[in-house]
A protein has these predicted regions:
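Glycine-rich, basic loop-to-helix element that forms the pyrophosphate-binding segment
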Residues: 10-27, 48
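Conserved nucleotide-sugar donor-binding catalytic segment
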Residues: 17, 25, 81-170
Length: 180
């Protein structure tokens, strides 16, 4: 219902990590889900994820499959982007295989793992998923419940063409802080 939807606006654009962290801090529920501006949730997403958690109480995070649209056309993700469930830390190392818009997670994870790293201008999600996947299994609902739209001029990955530099920065931080 509209009565439970609240909006927050930052004084200034400090990037996706700061925006998500604001939402996490302001959230009142025990389950947190994200929706990026260029993605779309399909009907039933939240219900399916809450059902997953009821059936699998050992999980504190799960994601759904996704449909990719690039420049207005449906495309198939490459094999390296294939999603997996369970203990997926090793699959998370080479690239980001968890999508913020596909995830629902228990707020307890943020209390234990921390929030999105606001010092990273990109790959802040990769950084968080690595920290989570090193300690928790990530569930997978094999039905697509989100559409990811890409190929548009203001897509974040176009702003930072050398994304690997931020993944390396995240890995260096994780190693130096003995997170693993």
């Amino acid at each position: 219902p509209a009565s439970v939807i609240r909006f927050f606006r930052s004084e200034k654009n400090r990037g996706p990590a700061a925006a998500r962290n604001l939402g996490i801090r302001e959230a009142r529920g025990e389950w947190i889900a994200f929706l990026d501006s260029d993605d779309e949730w399909l009907p039933g997403k939240l219900k399916a994820q809450l059902g997953f958690f009821r059936e699998n109480p050992e999980y504190l995070i799960c994601q759904t499959e996704e449909i990719w649209i690039r420049n207005g056309k449906r495309v198939n993700p490459m094999k390296k982007h294939q999603k997996s469930g369970g203990w997926i830390f090793d699959k998370c190392l080479p690239l980001c295989v968890v999508s913020p818009s596909a995830v629902m997670m228990h707020r307890k994870l943020f209390e234990e793992i921390g929030l999105f790293d606001e010092s990273l201008p990109a790959c802040e999600d990769y950084d968080l998923w690595l920290r989570i996947a090193s300690r928790y299994p990530i569930g997978l609902i094999e039905k697509p419940y989100i559409i990811k739209y890409g190929g548009h001029a203001d897509q974040r990955s176009r702003e930072f063409p050398a994304m690997d530099q931020f993944r390396i920065r995240s890995l260096a931080k994780i190693l130096s802080q003995n997170i693993l």
